């Protein structure tokens, strides 16, 4: 195993990621036969099959997945080495792959811009996705840091709080419950809901909140995979929604949406910076984490009672 080369590891990673020899070869600047030969030599030298050849493409075996994990760990180490060399030279440089859950896209651009003003030499690659997608990318070494709500529990991470994340019920202006005080869970559960897709952190929080009522989310309403579409659907009168307060500041101020006074809300979750515990933080990661922990909260909209029109301070 000590003779496995970086080129071979990158070959395995490309085939795992793209699933087809021709696509992996194109990504690596090789011909298909040359890449196939590399895989065959590696399988011969290690004595294990790295891929199952199927009609749908190349599917990694358990051995192939182990090589994939090693390849990504090596790439992480090389990136850390590059950043460390820059840090030793007195340069605040490096690359940061940042994952942000979709709710965070309403404040992440301002936060990133402020960080870049302080550390302009750090290159940031941003990925936006739902909770499940962000966790998968963090697990697979495809992002360095995630900005998200509840940290994952199925692998060890380093999680640090940087701000509050309130979740609220919203309705269109003029809804019968607008202005009603202390709405019960049982009453709100009788409404037609517009809910996020499975895997969304907001949906998980709503399921927990309504868990002691005799209702299932599938019975309550329509599933929509976009906060923007949910907001527009609520404004159009298609139902109510449970959503991050960070996504509705402008609509509430303009009077297009109202926040409902449901008992025990806002539900105050927290925002975290999350990274893998088994990964040494690069200087770029350290600089970004320090910035977010010290200044990130100021970029979060602040929601407070009373309801509904002046909910944002």
Curated annotation (Swiss-Prot):
DNA-binding region listed in the record: 21-40
Organism domain of life: Bacteria
Pfam families: HTH_1, LysR_substrate
PROSITE patterns: HTH_LYSR
InterPro entries: LysR_subst-bd (IPR005119), Tscrpt_reg_HTH_LysR (IPR000847), WH-like_DNA-bd_sf (IPR036388), WH_DNA-bd_sf (IPR036390)
Keywords, sorted A to Z: Activator, DNA-binding, Plasmid, Transcription, Transcription regulation
MF terms in GO: DNA-binding transcription factor activity; transcription cis-regulatory region binding
HTH lysR-type domain ranges (all copies): 1-61
Annotated family: Belongs to the LysR transcriptional regulatory family.
Reported function: Transcriptional activator for the cbb operon for RuBisCO and other Calvin cycle genes.
PANTHER family according to UniProt: HTH-TYPE TRANSCRIPTIONAL ACTIVATOR CMPR (PTHR30126:SF5), HTH-TYPE TRANSCRIPTIONAL REGULATOR (PTHR30126)
Protein name as it appears in the record: HTH-type transcriptional regulator CbbR
């Amino acid at each position: 195993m000590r003779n496995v080369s970086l080129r071979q590891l990158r070959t395995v990673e490309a085939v795992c990621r793209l699933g087809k020899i021709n696509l992996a070869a194109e990504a690596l600047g090789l011909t298909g036969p040359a890449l196939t030969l590399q895989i065959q030599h590696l399988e011969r030298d290690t004595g294990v099959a790295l891929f199952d050849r199927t009609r749908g493409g190349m599917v990694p075996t358990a051995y192939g997945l182990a090589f994939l994990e090693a390849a990504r760990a090596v790439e992480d180490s090389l990136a850390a080495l590059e950043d460390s060399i820059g840090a030793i030279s007195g340069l605040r440089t490096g690359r940061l792959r940042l994952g942000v859950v979709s709710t965070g896209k309403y404040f992440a651009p301002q936060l990133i811009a402020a960080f870049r003003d302080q550390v302009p030499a750090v290159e940031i690659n941003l990925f936006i996705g739902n909770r499940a997608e962000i966790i998968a990318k963090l697990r697979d070494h495809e992002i360095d840091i995630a900005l998200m709500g509840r940290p994952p529990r199925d692998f060890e991470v380093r999680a640090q709080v940087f701000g509050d994340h309130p979740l609220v019920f919203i309705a269109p202006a003029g809804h019968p419950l607008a202005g009603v005080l202390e709405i019960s869970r049982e009453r709100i559960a009788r409404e037609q809901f517009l809910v996020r897709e499975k895997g969304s952190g907001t949906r998980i929080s709503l399921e927990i909140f309504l868990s002691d009522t005799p209702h299932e989310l599938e019975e309550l309403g329509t599933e929509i995979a976009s906060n923007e579409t949910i907001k527009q659907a609520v404004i159009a009168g298609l139902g109510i929604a449970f959503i991050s307060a960070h996504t509705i500041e402008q609509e509430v101020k303009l009077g297009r949406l109202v926040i409902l006074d449901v008992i025990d809300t806002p539900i105050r979750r927290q925002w975290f910076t999350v990274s893998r515990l088994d990964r040494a933080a690069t200087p770029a990661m350290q600089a970004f984490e320090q910035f977010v922990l010290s200044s990130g909260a100021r970029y979060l909209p602040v929601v407070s009672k009373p309801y509904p029109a002046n909910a944002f301070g």
